[in-house]
Amino acid sequence: DPDQIRLHLEVLFAELAPDTSYPDGLLALRFLPPNSGRPIRKLFSWGDRDAAVEMAVRANADGMNGYVGVHPRKPGTSRAGQAADVGRAYWQFVDCDDGAASAKLLELPFSPNFIVTTGTQPTQRLHGYYMLEAPETNMAAYTARQEALATAVGGDNVKDAPRIMRLAGTVSYPSKDKAARGYVPELVT
């Protein structure tokens, strides 16, 4: 769904818009085949977000799983996923890959700014995103909060700043192993 893809990118990367604090930051997209094969990685400027949406639609239609780097990459970055490529964080997030962790996320006394549902079969899977009051440049402090949030809900230990997460508006295609465990292709919303 190109509209959901665009919305997800625009919410995550509002700080890249002109006249904001980080106009030269880059958004990172990655597309992975469900079983094996070559990934596709691409960095986009804020002004190229239409091309980012188009690429996501095409790659997903070709059976690739869509992911987005949660935080912008530094201007001039040519890679997609190294810690040194992320100079500031705008979000804390949590990856709940099972129903128990997803339920705990929804029970926390502080609600996420937004939630991405990555699947419902065989169990509910959610990503919760919390916008920071100010961009974080102390990556050690950021990582410590990521660990605490994951521990609080029993989520995946996704603590690194260059982390990629499922891209809303794309279909999640399970691997053969996951399909055998009851996962089915589902729209990430």
Where are these regions (language model features)?
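DNA replication initiation on ssDNA origins
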Residues: 1-90
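Small/flexible residues
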Residues: 8, 32, 43-44, 127, ...
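A structural signal for short, well-ordered beta-strand segments and their strand-loop junctions
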Residues: 23, 28-30, 116, 157-160, ...
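Short loop/turn segments at strand-loop or loop-helix junctions that form parts
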Residues: 30-34, 96-97, 118-120
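Secondary-structure transition/turn motif
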Residues: 46, 130-133
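DNA replication initiation modules
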Residues: 72-109, 132-189
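Extracellular-facing binding/remodeling surfaces
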Residues: 112
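Short, conserved phosphate-binding/catalytic loop or strand-edge motifs used
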Residues: 115-129, 165
